[in-house]
Structures are given as C-alpha cells and as structure tokens.
C-alpha cells in the first residue's frame, strides 16, 4: 500500500488520485477494512474476486454490499493494462507492450518451458542504470511502478492463459528497470503474489535480479523471504564491467562480492550470476578463468546468456563455438554453469527493445 511516507521516500512513484487495489497486501487490506469500520473477513472475499475469479471491476464483487463496493471504488482502482503490441515467437514466447493509465508503456514477457509458464515483469518505466548493452536505458528513467502495476502484469498474462486452462507458475523480475531502485514496491509485489490468498506462487518459483545495488543487497539478505536471487555480473574485472555497466563505478566487483557473501551467510541460499557474452569483450577463455577465480568458493551457478542483438548498441553475439568453450572452461575449473536457452530470437526479445521501437514510431 502506498502511504505518504512511501511517496516521500520514493520520489519516482506516480501521483495518482487513487492507488491500485492490487498494491495492497492481504494484511494491509484487512487493516484498511477495520479502519473503515468493516469486517476483517471481507479481505478474503475481495482477494478471491481479484485473484481467483480475476474480475475487472469492483462492481463485479457481488457478495459485497453496495456500500462497501462504493467505499472501495472511492479509494482504489482496479488497474488494467492496455495491450499496445503483442509479438509471438515461433518458440511460444510472447512479448507484450502494455500502456499504463498515464500513457507510459512497459514490457512483459511470457516464456513457455517444459516445467511451466514463466512471466518476466518490469518494475520501472525506463531505467537509469545505463548498461551499455541494454535497450531499457534508452530514454532514461521516467518513473517507478506501483506494486499493483507489477502485479497487474502477472494477472493480465494469467487472464490470457485462462482460456487454455494454463497458469503462471514462475516469475522472474528481469524486465525493464532495476528492481532494487524500486525496492519497497518490489517487496510488496513479492509478498502479494506469494500469498496463498492471492496468486500463491511459491517463493522458490520467483527470481529477483539486480545489477548490483549493494545497499539493497544487504537489505534483501535481511528479509524473511525465500526468493531466488540473481546478479547481473557480465565481467570479473572492474575495467570490463564498468564499460558494460557504469553502475560498477559506484559499486565495484570487490564490494559486490562482499555483499553476496553477506547474503549467503544470512540466507544459506545459492546465487545465480548472469553473464551475458559479448563478442570480443568478455567471451574469451581468459575471461572464464577470471570469473572462476572471482566466484570460487561461493554457492553459485553461472547462467551464460547469448545476448540478443540491439540495433542501437554496437555489441555483437559471441560465436556458438566460443560459448561452448566458455562453459566447458568454467566447468573444468569447478564452476556450475549452463547456457541459457535462447527464446524469442525472432521477435523484439531483448529487454526494452519493443518499447524502444514503439517510442521511435511515436516520435517520427
């Protein structure tokens, strides 16, 4: 729930007249109802309408009194996302460009796997981290999303899957934006979708990825939540990582590893390192050896990512043979590593690419 204190703390939050009803955790809905002189058990009914029956309006909540429905309408909106573009890949990946109520656009991706359906969600409109290989940073950061706007991405995809009686089984927070720069809303989102009164998606089926906002890594380590944790690393040496990710100048590799060690001491959980391979930049055997030396001794897994080409960026894909050699060298050195399966390569699958293309069309 967005309070005045939250707005003061998070200057990039939108200033809507009413906040999304999806931004309330179950306990917050209970407390709000009691404050309004309503019965606490109504929260369960409201959440059933929102997350099991997945209604699009408060008026459809027919087992609530008219007075309570009006009270809800006076204070909240049922956030709806308008589909601007839908691209479907031959491998079943679907990329959505959604329009928010203030006209900004965001991306959400549905990825189909043998083990279920995964949704990649966005946490910000744009991004200010400035990774030099990423289309998400084109145009900078416009604003943060409310927790309810992040929840709505999952719900909107779930509604599309309802027609074929499928369900969203995994969530990855790897879309546009840096989740740890919208930390409180991200945490509310996690607690909402994990709640068995809501979508009941297991914590171990949810992954949060960060570019390495070190203070928030310490905060995340102290949270009582079993969410999977991933770090975009992409290079073991500061010189190369700073070139790829300017955030490294503020939070360098040494400090990042220290924060990850703290996370593991607190949680005893494995960390995934995401390592995008860029031709001639970080994809040689010497880079694999540097990476292995850096993370040796950590409980970790390396996810090697053959990057999607972004026309606005100059990086090129690593040759397939070099990718296999890189993986083989890591394994030889005792590092658990896999190559991520490419999905959506025949559509605008790179993070932020579809939104960037749409912005170009709008400004012509």
From Swiss-Prot:
Disulfide bonds join 120-351. It is an enzyme of class 2 (transferase). The active site is at 107 (proton acceptor), 351 (s-methylcysteine intermediate). It is found in: Cytoplasm. The keyword DNA repair does not apply. Pfam families: Radical_SAM, RlmN_N. Specifically methylates position 2 of adenine 2503 in 23S rRNA and position 2 of adenine 37 in tRNAs. Confers resistance to some classes of antibiotics. This is Probable dual-specificity RNA methyltransferase RlmN. It comes from Staphylococcus aureus (strain MSSA476). The lineage of its organism: Bacteria, Bacillati, Bacillota, Bacilli, Bacillales.
